[in-house]
Amino acid sequence: ARVYLWAGDEQKAKEMALEVIQKGQITGSETFPWITTDAVNNRGDYPDRIFSTEVLFALYNTNRISIQNLQYNYTLNQFQLLTFIGNVAEGRVPVLYPNENDFRRKLHWAQRVNNTSNEILYFTKYLDVTDTEGISNTYRYMFPLIRISEMYLIAAETATTLDESAEYINKINIHRGLPEITLSSSDELNLVIENEYLKEFLGEGQSFFYFKRKQMTSIPSPSRPGVDRVLMQKGYYKFPLPESETSQRN
C-alpha cells in the first residue's frame, strides 16, 4: 500500500490497504487488534504505550531504553533533549492533541522536575516497562515500523468521498478515546490526515516520509504550532549519503 501510494496509484494503494485491514482485523480472530483501554489505563507501571497489538512489523532492540535516555530523558539539558515547546497544558501538546482523552496525549507525554528544579516536558513512548507476569515482554523492546492505523489513513487518503474518508479516520478515533468526526472539504481531510501522522507515528519516522511523499513546501513549526510553518525545500528531504558510498560512482 505504501509503495503504490508513492507511485501515485491510489486505487491499488487503497486495495492493498483494505486487504490488510480485512485480513488482519477479522472480527473475533484479529491478527492486529486495536489496543484496549485496559492495556492503556490499567497496567500500572507497564502500560502499552506502543499500542503493540496494532503493529504489523517492528524492530526488536534490547537497547531501547538507552535510546530513550539519550534523546528523551527529562534529565538531559535543553540542547540535548528532543521535546516539544511548552508543557502538557500549554504549547504544542494541546495543539496537536486538543482532546485530553486522546490515549496518545496521556501516554506519550509527561512532566517531571529535573535536577535544576525545572519542570520538564518529555516524550515517554519508549520508557522501559516491566512486570512480574511478563506481559510487557511483548512490547518492551519494540520499535514500530508499520501499523494497522497507517492502512486506515491510506484508505482515508484514497477514498472517493469525504464520508468514506471520515469512516476510516473514525475507526482510529474511537480506538484513541476520541469522538467521531465529519469532513466538509478536501482541505480539511488533508489537515486531519497530516495531524494523524504527527500524532500516530511520533518518534517512529513516518511523518517525515509523509511530508516527503506529498512534497510539502512547509511543515508545522515546533515552536509555534498552529501559527507558523517551517519552509521546506526538496533538498531537505534527501539524506546525505556517506562519501564512501558516493566516491566510487561514475
Task: Provide a role label for each language-model segment.
Residues 2-74, 80-88, 97-250:
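Acidic/polar-rich alpha-helix caps and helix-coil junctions
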